[in-house]
Amino acid sequence: MKIIQIHNKYRYFGGEDSVVDEEAKLLSSNNHEVNQLIRDNSEELISFQDKFNAFKNISYSFRSVEILNKELLKFGNPDIVHVHNTFPLWTYSVFDFFKKKNIPIIMTLHNYRLIWEKLGLFNKDREKYGYFKDSNIGSFIISKFINKQKNLLKNVSKFITHTEFTKYEFSKHVIPENKLVIKPNFLNSTNNKIQSISEKNNAIFASRISKEKGILTLIKAFTKIDINLDALGDGPLFKKVKKYNINNIKLHGNLPRDKVNKFINKSKFLVFPSEWYESFPMTILEAFREGTLVLASNIGSIKSIIKDRFNGILFEPGNTSDLIDKVKWILNNQRECDQIALNANNEFNQKYSSEVNYKQLIDV
């Protein structure tokens, strides 16, 4: 089968970018011909005029249509198109383009951009997060453009969501339920030895260094906890956090995925303190695979992935005191935590391996 992947990379490499790459490898390894059409924000957003042009074309990009025409001349018409992220450079013009050619389209809903306004993503102080470059004004303008483009979604045959929670939210607000299917993210299995928490040392945070990811709540908590924290990742608050110079928190910046996995494997537990809705965090999946305990905020689809004290530990998002209490519980109940981590690893093998996911993807 010939497949075209459409994706717009993010400024900070994250889970969505990783999923796109791994999915392409999975399909190719099963003898499918995959053509990745990847655009990057660095293409255009350099000068003021470039930024203005990108903003002007945000609802329909003639540049994207030009690229697609050239690629089809080289690659030929695919059997199916799999769209991931179209924002901001591809735009929804890709749906119109392939629909006119009668080529089926599926789209993975990696985030809640289509329904941000409906969900009202707030932090613990009831301040609405600026989901576009941390700007409420920019977010408002972008949401209006997105609303204008929603009629193009009728050109999509199927939408992939990652959990029951995400399927419910999208069906409630914008997409008919019969167009939604659930397919979680996946990772390749490893033969890494699962160690007891008592044999490991530090805690780990591996995500974007930004307020919606809960980094400030995490820092407040770990200044009052006697355990070291390795913080992996980059983001808008990286320099600010670095200036705090907290003794038991070490910032490592962005690292290659293999090094991230090594950190996760040797850590007592992974902290995932996000304070807004996630879809299906890859770092949680990596911890499941490595047999490392997950301590995560009880919000959004995380509640669909983690069953408290069965395959992970949940705490109230943005609640420093609750986070501290849960860390102390982990440190004082390591034998029980070993069983929780083992349950998570068993669940990974049953639900989230590449072998299981390939069948789910083809069934879509």
Predicted features along the sequence, with ranges:
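Short acidic/histidine- and often glycine-rich active-site loop of Leloir-type glycosyltransferases
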Residues: I284, I299-R309, I313-L314
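A short, well-ordered alpha-helix in the C-terminal region of glycosyltransferases
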Residues: D322, W329, E336-K351, N357-D363
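Carbohydrate-associated surface elements
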Residues: F165, F186
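Membrane-proximal helix-turn-helix segments that form the acceptor-binding/catalytic region
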Residues: K100, R113, D125-F159, Y168
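Conserved acidic donor-binding segment of nucleotide-sugar-dependent glycosyltransferases
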Residues: D308-R309, I313-T320, W329-Q334
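Nucleotide-activated donor-binding/catalytic signature segment of Leloir-type glycosyltransferases, i.e.
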Residues: K239-N261
